[in-house]
A protein has these predicted regions:
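Conserved, non-catalytic sequence blocks in retroelement Pol enzymes and Pol-derived host proteins
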Residues: 82-85, 118-125, 309-312, 330-334, ...
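Domain-level detector for long, ordered catalytic/regulatory cores in large eukaryotic signaling
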Residues: 1-41, 138-309
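Acidic, metal-ligating active-site segments
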Residues: 55-59, 65-66, 71-119, 169, ...
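Short coil/turn segments at secondary-structure boundaries
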Residues: 86-90, 107-109, 126-130, 152-154, ...
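Structured nucleic-acid-interacting core domains from mobile-element enzymes and related host factors
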Residues: 4-89
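Alpha-helical bundle/repeat cores within regulatory domains of eukaryotic proteins
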Residues: 335-377
Length: 377
């Protein structure tokens, strides 16, 4: 046995086929609940569920999901650590059955945990996913289809030159900065199905996606983006960092006078709120805890003073409730206040369970206000 083989890690998990058969055949009540997808009535003017999206609609146009018992599933993955030091990193592979009503499918009993990849370091997910994908391919071709798999698009990370999963647009560095990359426009060329099938390192796709062999594969549409990481942990955390610059030692949000000098225009930073004011806001947050119902899970602490252990949902609450009520009025200029308010409003709309065409138009308009303001700074 060679060294590589002796260090191989083995993953054991349930068979997807057996799990679906158990759900479909052993419980009549559960079987009736699974008819939600087949009976779903779509309103073209409203987005309420996965079944309103382009990926599922394209699949219907291709003749897929014609049987009432066809099962739609989606895969999620996320990394986590088991201790505060983060010495062991694991990845969870999670399956959600979309046939259940959106009002109940998020309950734990409707989820299937397929695998947890072993540590101590972040493992190569491809090797662990291949058996699962092989089984999904068998189910797809021999009995049933899958509408979406949210995993491993092969697109370069967000710090790279072409970070977007959906469009081909080169990121740029801020003026007088050698680090940090941003997408300044929203009119980039959309990525194609062929780029995902064959790869294109020169345009930010390192290789063909391991999902490309599935008949349901639709390139960028296959890789969904969920709100936990994009809005809460992404936008919420970024907004927190932008507004608490005086409470930290970071200078990355200040305009740099010269790339070779450590001179920053702190006074002209549009979202500046002084440290003392932010600390007072943190105390106000702490004082409101006694008014929170005991049935609420978790605790909302003074995030200004301590962020250790802060969850994505806490950054989400900070953005949606603390920023507009306690912080916006402390920002110096009316234009900057409006930009932050519109950003928060856009994120709030995006988090709604149901979106109309008017909602989408308002959301786009809100984000445009913030982006225009940011591009002028």
């Amino acid at each position: 046995m060679n060294h590589e083989a002796s260090n191989a890690q083995i993953m054991r998990g349930p068979a997807v086929d057996d799990l679906l058969k158990q759900i479909l055949l052993t419980n009549e009540t559960t079987r009736n609940e699974l008819s939600y997808r087949h009976n779903y009535e779509r309103n073209p003017q409203v987005l309420r569920d996965f079944f309103d999206g382009d990926l599922y609609q394209q699949s219907l146009d291709e003749g897929k999901f014609s049987d009432a018992d066809d099962c739609a599933v989606i895969l999620f993955t996320d990394a986590f650590v088991k201790d505060k030091k983060g010495t062991h990193t694991f990845n969870m592979v999670h399956l959600v059955i979309l046939n259940f009503d959106a009002k109940i499918r998020y309950h734990q009993k409707y989820h299937v945990r397929l695998a947890i990849t072993p540590g101590p370091s972040k493992s190569s997910l491809d090797s662990f996913l291949l058996p699962i994908l092989a089984e999904l391919y068998f189910l797809e071709t021999r009995g049933g289809d899958i509408p979406a798999i949210n995993f491993l698009s092969r697109v370069a990370p967000h710090q790279s030159a072409y970070p977007c999963k959906y469009c081909v647009h080169r990121a740029v560095h801020p003026q007088s900065r050698r680090h940090g990359t941003y997408l300044c426009r929203t009119d980039g060329e959309m990525r194609t199905l062929e780029q995902y099938r064959h790869g294109g390192p020169g345009r930010g796709i390192f290789g063909p996606s391991i999902f490309a062999g599935l008949d349901i594969f639709k390139g960028p549409l296959t890789f969904q983006i969920e709100e936990l990481h994009t809005i809460s942990r992404g936008g919420g955390f970024l907004l927190y960092a932008m507004l608490t610059v005086d409470n930290s030692k970071t200078t990355k949000y200040y305009h740099k006078m010269d790339p070779d000098l450590e001179d920053y225009e702190r006074e002209t930073y549009p979202f500046f709120v002084d440290k003392r004011t932010m600390e007072e806001i943190g105390q106000q947050i702490e004082e409101t805890r006694k008014y929170l119902p005991v049935t609420f899970e978790g605790s909302f602490l003074d995030m200004i003073k301590q962020t250790r252990g802060t969850r994505a949902v806490d950054y989400n609450d900070f953005m949606l409730y603390i920023v507009p009520t306690l912080i916006v009025s402390k920002i110096r200029t009316r234009a900057a206040q409006q930009a932050i308010t519109k950003l928060v409003r856009g994120c709030s709309i995006a988090l709604q369970r149901k979106l109309s065409v008017d909602d989408l138009n308002e959301m786009d308009a809100c984000f445009q206000v913030f982006f225009r303001f940011a591009s002028l700074r």
